[in-house]
Swiss-Prot record:
Entry's induction text: Encoded in an operon with groES, groEL, ydiN, ydiO and ydiP. This operon is heat-inducible.
Domain of life: Bacteria
Name of the protein in its database record: Uncharacterized protein YdiM
UniProt note: phenotype after gene disruption: No BsuMI restriction or methylation-related phenotype.
């Protein structure tokens, strides 16, 4: 099992690899007050003005079972699909168009992360 420091370092590296310039932020998470998934995955603070979490803050939140997320920087796209079958369909469509993305499974379905780099006027195949 990874130590807290290794886990946090790996998490921060992965966030910056997938979403360069993103900030790690605290999410509401499930609780007695937040039983609805869309509320649980929303940020606690106004993430646009709040500073991102430090490594030690991330470690404490993870240890306590809190949820964390990341802001989406310019050039980044996240497709959040709360149905696993629909997520697989969208992933297949992106693959067919030669869009490369990183996928993660979530409680309700999944998220697809894409970085847009100078696409120009790319035409989609029909």
């Amino acid at each position: 099992m990874l130590s807290d420091n290794n886990f946090v370092s790996e998490t921060l590296e992965n966030v910056q690899y997938l979403l360069p310039g993103a900030k790690v932020i605290k999410l509401r998470g499930y609780s007695r007050a937040h039983k609805v998934y869309t509320i649980a995955k929303s940020p606690v603070e106004k993430w646009k003005v709040a500073a991102g979490l430090s490594g030690s803050e991330i470690a404490i939140l993870i240890r306590k079972g809190h949820w964390i997320g990341a802001s989406i920087p310019a050039g980044g796209i996240v497709i959040d699909i709360d149905d696993s079958k629909q997520g697989e369909l969208v992933k297949g469509l992106l693959d067919a168009q030669n869009f490369h993305c990183h996928c993660i499974r979530t409680l309700m379905g999944g998220s697809l992360f894409l970085r847009i780099t100078n696409m120009g006027k790319r035409k989609l195949n029909k």
